[in-house]
């Protein structure tokens, strides 16, 4: 990342994985209570920010399928601008590589990187807690990326506690299918009564003899998604022939963990050509963590 008084270049918006995802209840307003562990990855979209003196927020690159006015990046910048009353504006360039509808948190991470970067570029110096309270207005996953550490998440995903995770390499496989999150959450057969667990329960997996991620929990959405989307089911089966695997979020991406980059790359080399595969190392901290206190 490069930093100057008028621009911030090469700001990573890291992907996330849900190492497990349990749905423990449903609220009267339709939102679901969940428990999960969010894992940051050293892989994601890259954003570039250039200061404008006319107060305008503009996305200067096209993102297919995402109109500028509904882009979470633009919404995040305008939300921060309205909250603080700053006279500054910004041009935002987005190098988009994360697939949408994949369960990797791409749009949410882009929004969080925007809030963090503009907190620095616009010299706002808002504390992390204040940015998180803004972030929840943009989506349930956005506060996690502002939190900036791997986390045990509860509530609708906004109750976060830091959790230390070992370094791993991941192969993330995404079929050519978009899975709408709302469709999965509304499915009548979705499990909504998984027994709550604790951080201690999760950390105890480190001493388990079972091969990770089979050693703890499951993704409650995976059964519904694989029933509705044959392509996701095929990815899960293919990866399971190599090593234990699990879907992240509401899909469509599926991941497996490896001890080395070499092992992950070797598995990726065998992927069918119609699937998108990426090898990424785990992160312990968001690259822009220092942009809020």
From Swiss-Prot:
The UniProt catalytic activity note for this protein reads: 4-CDP-2-C-methyl-D-erythritol + ATP = 4-CDP-2-C-methyl-D-erythritol 2-phosphate + ADP + H(+)
Alphabetized UniProt keyword annotations: ATP-binding, Isoprene biosynthesis, Kinase, Nucleotide-binding, Transferase
Q: What superkingdom does the record give? A: Bacteria
Q: From the UniProt record, give one GO term of the biological process aspect.
A: terpenoid biosynthetic process
Identify the pathway: Isoprenoid biosynthesis; isopentenyl diphosphate biosynthesis via DXP pathway; isopentenyl diphosphate from 1-deoxy-D-xylulose 5-phosphate: step 3/6
Query: Binding positions for ATP?
Result: 99-109
Record PANTHER family:
4-DIPHOSPHOCYTIDYL-2-C-METHYL-D-ERYTHRITOL KINASE, CHLOROPLASTIC (PTHR43527:SF2)
Q: Which family does it belong to?
A: Belongs to the GHMP kinase family. IspE subfamily.
What is this protein called in UniProt?
A: 4-diphosphocytidyl-2-C-methyl-D-erythritol kinase
Top-down, what is the taxonomic lineage of the species of origin? Bacteria, Pseudomonadati, Pseudomonadota, Betaproteobacteria, Burkholderiales
